[in-house]
Amino acid sequence: MENLLSTVNAILITGPTASGKSALAVELAKRHGGAVVNADSMQVYDTLRVLTARPSEVEMQGVPHHLYGHVPAGAAYSTGAWLRDVSALLPALRAAGQLPVFVGGTGLYFKALTGGLSDMPDIPEALREELRGRLLMEGPDRLHAELAEVDPAMAAGLNRQDGQRIVRALEVVKATGRSIADFQGQSGPVVIDAAQARKIVVLPERAVLHARINGRFEKMLRERAEDEVRALLALGLPAEAPVMKAIGVSQMAAMLSGEMTRDDVLEKGAAATRQYAKRQMTWFRNQMDESWERLTL
């Protein structure tokens, strides 16, 4: 077994959904005595293991995996929260001599990891819950009008129906008395020095990726992902909860209510996944510079 700890501080692997990056992470972790660390914003939740393609015990192949399924479905979990969890985890991995292998399709996580994300303030949970509740009861227009009174420049740049961003801007100004724009201009802490990491972006050919996406969604249906969605819906979470926006939730909810057939779910779920993968591919091509290795798996 080759150990890279003396030459690199981490391996970073990203790419669109269904690109094969999780299997690559396991392969590299086994080769270099590493541990896999999740960098996917949907795979952090303790629900939807099948629907979010969280690695199974078989797929993990005995390699330690961290930050998967550790967040309750209804909990607020931001990029900053993920970064704090990573910062708390890394000393233990270093002490064990394990090379961290980060893998996931959430580009902002990688920007945060290497210090390219704004250092946002902590928001009191009570304030966050209050504003999320008001968003549900009053709607985004009302909160947008309130934001316009205290931070007109930020309000002017936001879509009046973008409830999540409106709430985010409001909670920052209420908690700090400052515009969120003030914090967006500041760089966050560097947790992983990008210059000392091996960085890989997996960019499969379009036809290959689409075939994998179709196959993955068929597999999810065979593994009864709708049971996960049924359990999720039973929690009564607000539609604004991030976990409710996982691809496949709305389609399977429609199937459970009799509004869609299983074939409809397969077609529409796979189509939504392909669109998401297309957005990811565009983001990676624009954001990942030449220091990232391009792989086609």
Swiss-Prot record:
Q: Which Pfam families match?
A: IPPT
| UniProt enzyme class | transferase
What residues bind ATP, as annotated?
Answer: G15, P16, T17, A18, S19, G20, K21, S22
Q: Which cofactor does it need?
A: Mg(2+)
Q: Name one GO molecular function term.
A: tRNA dimethylallyltransferase activity
Protein's GO biological process: tRNA modification
Q: What is its EC number?
A: 2.5.1.75
What quaternary structure, including any partners, is listed in this protein's UniProt entry?
Monomer.
Q: What is this protein called?
A: tRNA dimethylallyltransferase
What is the originating organism of this protein?
Answer: Rhizobium leguminosarum bv. trifolii (strain WSM2304)
Could you read off the lineage of the organism from its UniProt record? Answer: Bacteria, Pseudomonadati, Pseudomonadota, Alphaproteobacteria, Hyphomicrobiales
